Amino acid sequence: MDFSNTYRNYGEVVDFPEDFLSDYVPTVKSEPEPAAIAPSVCEPPISTTRNYGTDFGRASSMCGSSSSSSSSSYSSGSSPNYLTENGGDTEEPRFEELVSRKMSFDSENVAQVSNQMDYARDTYADSRIPFASIDSNDALLPYPVNNYVAALPVPVPAKKSRGRTAPRTPKSLETSKPGRGVKRPASKEIDAKDLGIGDLSAHMNRQIGDDEELDTQLIAHRILDELKEQCIPQASLAVKVLGRSQGTLSDLLRKPKPWGIMKNGRGTFQRMANWLDLDPVVRRALCFMKKEDVARITGMAEPTPAKRARQTTPSDERIRRFTFTQTQLDSLHTVFQQQDRPNREMQQALSATLKLNRSTVGNFFMNARRRLPKAAPVSQNLVAEHAIDHNQPGPSHHY
């Protein structure tokens, strides 16, 4: 019996061996069909479609529809029995019997078919093609065997969870998380001796001629692109290479003024242009060296701190508070009652008489005025008292 029939299942051809089901399907001699029998006998055609349920149902319906009509014809004896061999006693098994025999084959064949189905399932899973589009209630998958539809048991696929799960991506194809694609430079500073960078002071300190100008807009754009591509912190370039603060460099790069009207930033832009002319490896290395090494290599003088306007003196050299003698204090109070704002000549005369500095005399009168309550000036009070003593009216103010 020839079992070389094949069945196409979702693009894959399943070949049946010659000895497949040889123990269960008997060999039947093929004879010409009698002319009296209509072509609606229980012999379904070979299915080549993918709709398993339709083919199996079609075969069952054909068997069911022909069973009633054939039984009446067989009983009447008007036509020979098609399922008998030469009109003898041996009948060919019906389609239902073939199905029942096939369903009762031993565990070895079940394991063989299960292995074939597992292989097919793995193949379809790799190509991301669904294994079978049949309902979970269907447990039979028809296969054409010698012009008969033999139903083979098929493992029912497990029901998937309701939640959608994204297909797993191999680790080799996984992309890095956002923000981790670019390797950040190490924060540890490197040594100039390891890189072998020589003296760059002549290159970094060169100046252009008086009749030449630099394109500040272009230099600013190139600096920003270089910092972004090489992952260089702006503060490192500003402090170590340019000798400026990070805020000053940010202002120069954000709003670069034309070279003609620029006054204070020309040296910084000249140094930036010299830095851009260096090799890319050297440019990046200068920004991650120690500040002292960069200053030594590039010949940049370290910035000196601004001198404080008033330096603190040691505690033993502090200026002590001046104390007046009682005679000096009485003389100054007497003059203050008569004139709270003495002129320069009067202050000099007092300082010479009392043996004091003129600044000390001036400070005394200023402090005395601050201690007075907010009232009429001392000179007006003295005039008013003098008028009362002599029974004369005081000064009147006419507005």
Curated annotation (Swiss-Prot):
Key words of the record: Chromosome, DNA-binding, Homeobox, Nucleus, Transcription, Transcription regulation
Lipid metabolism is among the record's keywords: no
Pfam families the UniProt entry points to: CUT (PF02376), Homeodomain (PF00046)
Gene3D superfamilies: Homeodomain-like, lambda repressor-like DNA-binding domains
Tissues showing expression: Expressed in hermaphrodite gonads.
Example GO molecular function: DNA-binding transcription factor activity, RNA polymerase II-specific
The family this protein is said to belong to: Belongs to the CUT homeobox family.
Name recorded for this polypeptide: Homeobox protein ceh-39
Organism of derivation: Caenorhabditis elegans
